């Protein structure tokens, strides 16, 4: 495999080319990309955890340092002002020397407010990309050039096509997340609480809870019916029935996002349903290819959900086609089949049909689908179907013409298990689909 340094060199060349094109299209001279700043909690002197500007970490794997600035023009070596204060109160990251620093000019910035004297004097035609517009105004950036929509749309669109460097980083993030999932399953099998399972996960991945790319979903029993459950009970339930873990990891700023579901017992209806959802997820991935709309795969999985609802006699006396047509599958899988993945967990440009930002919304029937694009080589996506037993979604179906088709007794028996979700991260290639998650033998 090529070294990360050589992959990064090519990555920078790609970003430079995209920058040249964007600057030419929008008649700008350069982009000033801000890592961000710390913001204090209201009426307090403690800051919120720092989250770096994703457009900044696209260029450099600097994810924990605020007050950094990057100047890029698509021609000259990118120039990074790296915040390096004299500070005995807080940890100060040293000036980086790593695989990537040969391709970026790194300059120490001793004072956060010192950037103004270091930038080019003529700034009227520089675009600012960052989270603090007032800082850009103070630096003399034109208001119309602060986070210009056309530039951001352009950069977001092409972020969908991962470079080989980005894919290498994402494969490393997968390894970390897989380690965490294995440790979490072991903790579940030993009877730990959600809180303690989460600690086991973080320890195995080498992350703090502020470093993971999203809040871990560690859901035992009926908590698995809450799609984004993040409470973390300190006490283990008296009876362990099920465990849904949706948790990721980050490497050089790139995310992994995996979900697995386990049954405490191997010989009940729920365990068989977990196996069947897993099998159908793999079967769907086996059909995926470039040139097909992601929406089509979402719709196809509703047909697979219908098959499972019929097989497990959760819905009875109705054809699979009629289930999908009348949206009886909807309350059981209320979210989309997945989303784009990269520098952000829900990565950008999911609805963009071109580099001008043309928007194609999700189908009205499936409003929570996060991706409506045609699959193309270089795209990275999650595939995360599920079946859940959520009373607020099932309640409207308890009356009306379709109520008789719901096996309410079976549904009540499954509700204490919460739900099921299986999620892998896949890369679209020209002639195949790479499943980064299964390649690491995570069952």
UniProtKB/Swiss-Prot annotation:
GO cellular component: cytosol
Keyword Electron transport tagged: no
Record's catalysed reaction(s): Xaa-L-Pro dipeptide + H2O = an L-alpha-amino acid + L-proline
Residues noted as binding Mn(2+) 1 in the record, renumbered to the chain: 257, 339, 384, 423
Record-linked SUPFAM superfamilies: Creatinase/aminopeptidase
Cofactor list: Mn(2+)
Sequence positions that bind Mn(2+) 2: 246, 257, 423
InterPro entries to which the protein is assigned, alphabetical: Creatin/AminoP/Spt16_N, Creatinase/aminopeptidase-like, PepQ_N, Pept_M24, Peptidase_M24B_aminopep-P_CS, X-Pro_dipept-like, X_Pro_dipept
Recorded superkingdom: Bacteria
GO BP, sorted A to Z: proteolysis
Details of cofactor binding: Binds 2 manganese ions per subunit.
Enzyme class: hydrolase
Keyword annotations of the record: Dipeptidase, Hydrolase, Manganese, Metal-binding, Metalloprotease, Protease
This enzyme's EC code(s): 3.4.13.9
Gene3D superfamilies: Creatinase/methionine aminopeptidase superfamily, Creatinase/prolidase N-terminal domain
One of the record's GO molecular function terms: proline dipeptidase activity
Primary role: Splits dipeptides with a prolyl residue in the C-terminal position.
Record family assignment: Belongs to the peptidase M24B family. Bacterial-type prolidase subfamily.
HAMAP family: X_Pro_dipeptid (MF_01279)
Protein name (database record): Xaa-Pro dipeptidase
Gene behind the chain: pepQ
